[in-house]
Amino acid sequence: MLILGFESSCDETGVALVAADHGERPRLLAHALHSQVAMHEAYGGVVPELASRDHIRRALPLTRQVLAEAGRALADVDVVAYTRGPGLAGALLVGSAVACALAAALDRPVLGIHHLEGHLLSPFLSVDPPQFPFVALLVSGGHTQLMRVDGVGDYALLGETIDDAAGEAFDKSAKLLGLGYPGGPALARLAEFGDPTAYALPRPLLHRDTLDFSFAGLKTAVRTQVLKLGEGVCEQPRADLAAATQAAIVEVLVKKSLAALRATRLQRLVVAGGVGANRSLRSQLDAACAKRGVRVHYPEVSLCTDNGAMIALAAAMRLQAGRATARRDHAFDVQPRWPLAALDVGVP
């Protein structure tokens, strides 16, 4: 079974082809990704209308590229999958329209996929895939969640952010520091030259008996420190503040993940989403989990960002597990707001 997957939830257009033979782990045959970072950089953030227009321009050329790299024809595709939500409504509509139009032209079934489920399952494309059950730390864009995962489609929410997500804390702090877009990677790069102990920043909810997160107070503390520094400050204090900010976010993510592992008595942790590519987070999680005999699994770094491979993979795993049915009516809708915990089994 060949599954063609489309991702268009925000500012990346992703297309991928996955092979899912009966009883075997899905294999990624080819994938292509176009990032809109350069286009949105001048605006300091994603402009939804521009994002939608660019998805229209990129979807079919990327599809041709993927098929050529895989040595397959469009007629070889058995199922077409797309990101149904959550995300930007216009961007989601572009991806779903392209996917459903292709499926209708080919007379193939189509399947809508939850964006966060794609991230959650993406480590199954790595050379060292996890086994169920496990705890998942999802740190993607506006989402920060801890989930217990007992199988495909079997997810229980353990904790989530009550305000800003970790990715938003990175991006908003970077903006306060006058760094470029996207802010998270820029802050992480600057943090390499700073002293994380130079500023005492808060770790909200860290010592509370909860697996929920809160990063709004940290953002406020960073703003306060930036105002104290004033304009024209030299680079070192900015690097120190970047390092302290990253240290605060990472400490919360690591300690909450360990608490979730203790609460569930599980020995496997999956970390997925864009923030999962952060080197400081990976190194500290690896060290903390190694002391406790916990296995940690990540996606390949290139698959931490939004991509079509994770959508095609999630579709393959859902179909193999009997947790979804691809449909042939080719009508489509999108879910810009769609909690993963509310994901219904069998809803295309």
Swiss-Prot record:
Localisation: Cytoplasm
MF term (GO), any: iron ion binding
HAMAP family (UniProt xref): TsaD
Residues engaged in binding substrate: 138-142, 171, 184, 278
Cofactor notes: Binds 1 Fe(2+) ion per subunit.
Top-level division of the source organism's lineage: Bacteria
GO cellular component: cytoplasm
The protein's role, per its UniProt record: Required for the formation of a threonylcarbamoyl group on adenosine at position 37 (t(6)A37) in tRNAs that read codons beginning with adenine. Is involved in the transfer of the threonylcarbamoyl moiety of threonylcarbamoyl-AMP (TC-AMP) to the N6 group of A37, together with TsaE and TsaB. TsaD likely plays a direct catalytic role in this reaction.
Keywords: Acyltransferase, Cytoplasm, Iron, Metal-binding, Transferase, tRNA processing
Name of the featured protein: tRNA N6-adenosine threonylcarbamoyltransferase
Family in the record: Belongs to the KAE1 / TsaD family.
Gene Ontology BP term (one): tRNA threonylcarbamoyladenosine modification
Keyword Translocase included in the entry's annotation: no
Positions of Fe cation binding: 115, 119, 306
Primary subcellular site in the record, as a coarse category: cytoplasm
Spans traversing the lipid bilayer: none
E.C. code: 2.3.1.234
Organism whose genome encodes this protein: Methylibium petroleiphilum (strain ATCC BAA-1232 / LMG 22953 / PM1)
